[in-house]
Amino acid sequence: MATIEAIHTATIQVLLADGVGRLTTTRVSERAGVSVGTMYQYYPHKQALLFAIVERQLDLIVRAMLEAAERLEGCDLRTVSDGLATAWLDAKMADLVSSRAIYAIAAEFDLAELMSRAKNLMVEAISPLLRAIPDARFADPDVTAFMLAALLGGTVRVVMEAGSSEDDLERLRQELPRACLGYLKMSACPLCPSDE
């Protein structure tokens, strides 16, 4: 496990220093302090290594969102909105360096399958949560969950890819929950008198 962690850390470092185009398994193995043979034991080529890095990051985000959904079940609309935005930001900002490096990988490789799997898991986590909100109803919680995940992911990506300052990231922490709440309020159907 320590070897894999060293390889992942070295990959991120090489990515950020030199970009995807100059990343090689040899350069990563040198930076990680492992032999090329050891490197190939885990990752037979550059693409396998980069996909593993992306998958690991996506898994962390999905896990954070699943935990948030479990914790927020049955809460009111504002609490759910704020909780999901905060969980997303916490997961993405826990390792800003890795998060930014992932976007470089995404620009170079077709990650549609990995991204689709992550999107489906997010919708599966958020949709039931939206159904359980006592003070809001949604005509199609799956569509609303998809759009909320897109809002979270797209907004954070734009800010991170721009190499934003600490002030920008703090502003994102303040504004993203408001954007999510606004979207959810606009997407909610009026409650029937019997639902209020």
Language-model segments: residues:
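N-terminal intrinsically disordered/low-complexity leader segments
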Residues: 1-2, 13, 187-196
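Short hydrophobic/aromatic patch on the recognition helix
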Residues: 33-43
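Amphipathic alpha-helical segments enriched in hydrophobic/aromatic and basic residues
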Residues: 15, 24-25, 46, 50-57, ...
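Short linear capping/connector segments at secondary-structure termini
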Residues: 67-70, 101-109
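Amphipathic alpha-helical packing segments from all-alpha helical-bundle domains
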Residues: 56-66, 79-86, 90-94, 109-134, ...
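Basic, helix-initiating cap at the start of DNA-binding domains
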Residues: 1-18, 26-27, 31, 48
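Hydrophobic/aromatic-rich alpha-helical bundle segments in the mid-to-C-terminal region
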Residues: 99-104, 112, 131-179, 191-192
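Short hydrophobic clusters on alpha-helical segments that form packing/core surfaces
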Residues: 7-15, 57, 61, 88, ...
